[in-house]
Regions:
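Disulfide-bonded cysteine-rich modules in secreted/extracellular proteins
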Residues: 67-71, 87-96, 111-120, 160-171, ...
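Extracellular/luminal regions of secreted and cell-surface proteins that mediate adhesion/ECM remodeling
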Residues: 660-784
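Short beta-strand-to-coil "C-cap" segments at the C-terminal boundary of structured domains/repeats
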Residues: 27-29, 85-86, 156-158, 606-612, ...
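Short domain-boundary/entry signatures in modular proteins, especially
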Residues: 64-66, 82-90, 106-115, 155-162, ...
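Sec-dependent N-terminal signal peptides
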Residues: 1-32
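Extracytoplasmic/lumenal domain signature
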Residues: 156-665
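Ser/Thr-rich, Pro/Gly/Ala-heavy low-complexity intrinsically disordered linkers and tails
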Residues: 21-84, 97, 102-104, 122, ...
């Protein structure tokens, strides 16, 4: 059963003159829009709280004073504060004057003209009903959506209702109540949403065998900025003919009109060709607005591309480039690019710190390990300061690290795989211990009770094993756990038991599941809490199968064919189409002999929940060592990165999250009134009074009579919304009716508007759906 957190949801009351698209002023509409359950409009054109914004959208002249608040007065006015006020200016007990508008029972002066909420002060939104519609103006050069810009004016966001202070059905509306949709737990139904690539392409040229990144590269919304409101790009490398170590082609694809579109691709040619088997990273590295991508080359250089796919710079040859990380190590606002052995200036690729580590270190991550407020460089067995000086070493070796505070004592642990001997290490800094480290675990065999002989003799899976670890709370006990893949299995180890010296190594396993990765035995994984219940699920792909495992016991919640020669890549989770739902992004390739009963896959695929029940998540995953606090959703790299392991609801690694508002949902309401100047028309204003955005394309039906009781849909209906509606935002839809039925025009037949009409299938859920219909009169008063 769907779980809804149903509280009374108040809604925005905005009394204003007609928008420019309707006419500067008019005296039309002799009745207020009403909800069938509300009992009519409140004083001041306010509506009541269940069925819509209520109230006439258009004002009338004031009449005599000395009236009773909330009652009609004069010639179409409403009494407010003992004064007969124009209907459009009445605001509870006040009568707004001059340029003021009524917003949630408060008279406010609209702020500056805006095209987006980012142009408004904090705590404000862009009210498009107060601005001008799109007029064909030229958008910025980076605009990819092809739309011109509408404008609005900044207004204060409505306050959130205090607990127990929600307005009653007929009370004045002063705040918005919490709006959340709670997905059903246990209903896990992934479906394929988008795909790019053909397993039968010539020379298997659509093969991908590296973890993609998700970042914003262009202005899809045409608001003049590239930010989290745009549709992110998926960036990845392909290779041809099985040559996964040479001549990679980088691609940027994105969802446009419900399908993948390739924005650009680039091949560097024979001079320093891109390495298609190495990781990439994305973010704003040069201080200029917009994001860049950094990749490794075959000759161990680093190449940077701008957002349009043009080369920005190419570094000098280095000791190694394997998994680039982007971070602002010296907190000067200009990020660095950190690769195995050196640190580069993000702006131009020049060397900032010379070689400081042997090139056989195959992965680095960044995190503040000693609590001094500055990021450190972390390998499987060493920690360095940002200037390249070593803080400590275990001497154990190892390949892939992750960071998390397993016992939540404020001292972070390094969880590392030792690939050569399929071992797991756990250690942390301790200035009072030998070599400055305390080794907590060093001999855990990640194969557990699985036999390496499940892989062919001599294969990587039979001898070695251990991919990049993840850190997350898999069993819901409030403490993070560790997980990683090997050649024959995927293992989750209990973080509390790992930190307990009395627990034998073999008893630290929470669970282990047999898998098949004999070729590399080093694949990674990612983590996400799809149902928002506080328990993480594992997303993992081996040579033939994409799996989603339940965190507590490893139950296989989902599996599907996904052929992959494997290196150290992993599937990841992000919102790639900006629909407010998490998506799984997985890569595959067809060059090898791996198949599923003859079937192969290749390229990039995106899976989502069939019923739209996965919770919200971020629209970014910018590097292999992603850990949330390392990047903002718009790709900005923080000058001072807060430690992930100290942040509420985090303390994880390679797990995407929505730290705040993961259950936030939209809530659409609607008002309706006639247009009486010029040709007759009906205008519906659709407003989102929820806490999450709703995509464009929501149908709005117009009816003569109640559609639930045989009402007739009017000609030209339904219309659809044309823009994403973020919380508090509205859009006006105009239904031209030059030949409107007589009963509609004279008011003898009530008019109705329904938002999300007929509830077509979509992946978003409102926190309530009983406020989507509104009734009004279509009659016009005689102009004075």
């Amino acid at each position: 059963m769907i779980r809804l957190r149903r509280a009374h949801l108040a809604f925005l009351v905005l009394c204003l003159a007609a928008p420019a698209a309707i006419g500067a002023s008019c005296t039309c509409g002799d009745g207020d829009s009403q909800s069938e359950t509300s009992g009519g409009a409140a004083g001041g054109g306010g509506g009541t709280g269940v069925g819509g914004e209520g109230g006439s959208l258009f004002g009338n002249d004031a009449g005599d004073a000395g009236c009773v608040d909330g009652e009609a007065c004069g010639d179409g006015g409403i009494c407010a504060g003992g004064v007969c006020c124009e209907a459009g200016q009445a605001c509870g007990a006040a009568c707004c004057g001059g340029v003021e508008v009524c917003s949630f029972q408060q008279c406010v002066v609209p702020g500056a003209v805006c095209i987006d909420a980012t142009e408004c002060p904090d705590g404000h939104y862009c009210e498009y009903a107060l601005g001008e519609p799109s007029d064909g103006g030229v958008a910025d050069a980076g605009c990819q959506g092809g739309a011109s810009l509408a404008t609005g004016k900044c207004l204060p966001k409505p306050p959130e209702c205090a607990p127990g202070q929600e307005p009653g059905p007929n009370d004045p509306l002063t705040c918005l109540s919490k709006c959340e949709y709670m997905p059903p737990v246990g209903a896990f139904s992934p479906v394929l949403k988008y795909s790019w690539g053909d397993p039968a392409a010539p020379q298997t040229r659509d093969s991908v065998m590296m973890a993609p990144v998700i970042a914003q590269l262009d202005d899809d919304t045409c608001d003049g900025v590239v930010d989290e409101r745009d549709i992110p790009e998926i960036i990845f490398m392909t290779f041809t003919g099985g040559a996964y170590n040479d001549n990679g082609t980088i691609h940027a694809i994105s969802v446009v009109n419900g399908a993948f579109v390739e924005k650009w691709s680039a091949n560097a040619g024979v001079t320093s060709p891109n390495h298609p088997g190495r990781s990439i990273a994305a973010g704003n590295i040069d201080g200029v607005p917009g994001n860049e991508i950094v990749v490794c080359t075959v000759d161990k250089r680093v190449r940077a591309y701008d957002a349009a796919g043009a080369q920005l710079w190419l570094s000098a040859p280095g000791s190694e480039c394997f998994m680039p990380s982007i971070a602002d190590l010296d907190q000067d606002g200009l990020p660095e690019v950190v690769v195995e052995g050196q640190i580069l200036n993000g702006a131009d690729g020049s060397q900032k710190v010379p070689a400081f580590d042997p090139p056989n270190t195959m992965n680095i991550v960044v995190s503040d390990m000693d609590g001094d407020g500055f990021l450190d460089i972390v390998t499987a067995d060493k920690v360095y300061r940002a200037d390249g000086t070593m803080i400590a070493t275990t001497g154990l070796g190892g390949r892939y690290p992750a960071v998390g505070d397993l016992d939540k004592d404020g001292v972070p642990e390094i969880i590392a795989s030792e690939y050569q001997n399929h071992k797991l290490f756990v250690w942390h800094l301790d200035p009072n211990a030998p070599n400055g480290v305390q080794i907590i675990r060093q001999d855990i065999d990640i194969n557990g009770d699985l036999n390496p002989g499940l892989c062919p003799v001599g294969s990587a899976g039979a001898i070695r094993g251990g991919g990049p670890p993840t850190v997350a709370d898999f069993n819901g006990d409030g403490f993070p756990d560790a997980a990683l893949a090997g050649g024959v299995g995927y293992a989750v180890l209990d973080g509390t038991k790992l930190m307990d010296p009395a627990t034998p190594d073999a008893e630290t396993f929470l669970w282990i599941k047999q898998t098949q990765d004999c070729s590399s035995a080093a694949t990674g994984s990612s983590v996400f809490d799809f149902e928002g219940d506080g328990i993480a699920e594992v997303v993992y792909g081996d040579e033939v199968t994409l799996h989603v495992y339940a965190g507590p016991d490893g139950a296989d919640l989902f599996q599907t064919c996904n052929t992959n020669g494997t290196l150290f890549e992993y599937p990841l989770v992000a919102d790639v189409d900006n629909d407010g739902q998490a998506d799984i992004v997985v890569v595959s390739n067809s060059y090898s002999g791996f198949n599923c009963a003859g079937e192969k896959t290749s390229g990039v695929r995106v899976f989502g929940d069939a019923n739209g029940n996965w919770v919200r998540t971020r629209r970014v995953w910018n590097q292999h060592g992603y850990h949330v606090t390392n990047v903002a959703e718009d790709g900005t790299i923080p000058a001072v990165e807060p430690p992930n392991y100290t942040q509420p609801k985090l303390n994880n690694f390679r797990q995407n999250v929505q730290p705040l508002g993961e259950f936030s949902a939209p809530d659409l309401v609607i008002t309706l009134a006639p247009r009486c100047i010029g040709d007759y028309a009906l205008m519906a204003r659709v407003r989102n009074i929820g806490e999450a955005a709703v995509p464009a394309g929501v149908p709005v039906g117009f009816y003569a009579g109640d559609p639930g009781a045989g009402g007739i849909q009017l000609a030209g209906s339904p219309l659809v919304t044309t823009k994403v509606l973020y919380p508090a935002e509205a859009e006006d839809l105009l239904l031209e009716l030059p030949d409107a039925p007589t009963g509609v025009k004279d008011g003898s037949v009530p008019i109705y508007a329904v938002v999300d009409d007929n509830a077509p299938p979509h992946t978003w859920h409102e926190c309530r759906e009983d406020n989507n219909k509104v009734m009004a009169s279509g009659a016009c008063t005689t102009p004075r």
